């Protein structure tokens, strides 16, 4: 990727009970160093609730798909199972030359789907702590240059 500021689509479980918003916030903060994160609200439940309070499901879909089409890369936190994240990863898998990083905690309740961890167009990485998140994102972004 060139020196032009990246547009980044971040996704993670929002309605699920296992969302780790502290890790999401670390991810969004790190991604913000490399470009514009179109979906920062995912990391902040109070912001998300405020944004989506008056939106119906179709409006949420249309908004998110629009952000996806504007983005140049995707970073997905896939530790907690999520239908929405699966949908977003489906979009990413069908888009040519679209770089996608999937992050998952090493110690977790659920095993990541082989359709995500084994997808040849995704970079799948596991982390143990926030320092790992920072290092993985830095390496991913370095590869884009």
UniProtKB/Swiss-Prot annotation:
GO BP annotations listed: deoxyribonucleoside monophosphate catabolic process; nucleoside metabolic process; nucleotide metabolic process
Where does this polypeptide localize?
Cytoplasm; Nucleus
Give the keywords, sorted: Cytoplasm, Glycosidase, Hydrolase, Nucleotide metabolism, Nucleus
**Protein residues bound to substrate:** 9-15, 24, 41, 88, 113-115
What cellular-component terms does GO give this entry? cytoplasm; nucleus
- What is its EC class? hydrolase
Q: Which EC number(s) does UniProt give? A: 3.2.2.-
> Where is this protein chiefly located?
cytoplasm
Its UniProt entry gives the catalysed reaction(s) as: a pyrimidine 2'-deoxyribonucleoside 5'-phosphate + H2O = a pyrimidine nucleobase + 2-deoxy-D-ribose 5-phosphate; a purine 2'-deoxyribonucleoside 5'-phosphate + H2O = a purine nucleobase + 2-deoxy-D-ribose 5-phosphate
Q: Name one GO molecular function term.
A: 5-hydroxymethyl-dUMP N-hydrolase activity
Would you identify the family this protein belongs to, as annotated? Belongs to the 2'-deoxynucleoside 5'-phosphate N-hydrolase 1 family.
On subunit structure and binding partners, the annotation says: Monomer and homodimer.
Question: Could you tell me what this protein does?
Answer: Catalyzes the cleavage of the N-glycosidic bond of deoxyribonucleoside 5'-monophosphates to yield deoxyribose 5-phosphate and a purine or pyrimidine base.
Q: What is this protein called?
A: Putative 2'-deoxynucleoside 5'-phosphate N-hydrolase 1
Highest classification ranks of the organism: Eukaryota, Sar, Alveolata, Ciliophora, Intramacronucleata
């Amino acid at each position: 990727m060139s020196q032009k500021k990246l547009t980044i689509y971040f996704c993670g479980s929002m309605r699920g009970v296992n969302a780790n918003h502290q890790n999401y916030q670390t991810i969004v903060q790190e991604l913000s160093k490399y470009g514009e994160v179109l979906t920062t609200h995912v990391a902040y439940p109070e912001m998300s609730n405020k944004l989506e309070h008056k939106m119906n499901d179709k409006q949420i879909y249309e908004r998110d798909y629009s952000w996806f089409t504007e983005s140049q890369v995707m970073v997905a936190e896939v530790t907690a199972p999520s239908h929405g994240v699966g949908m977003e990863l489906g979009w990413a898998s069908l888009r040519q030359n679209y770089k996608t990083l999937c992050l998952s905690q090493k110690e977790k309740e659920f095993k990541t789907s082989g359709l995500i961890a084994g997808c040849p167009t995704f970079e799948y990485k596991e982390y143990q702590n926030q320092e790992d998140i920072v290092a993985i994102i830095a390496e991913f972004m370095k590869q884009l240059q």
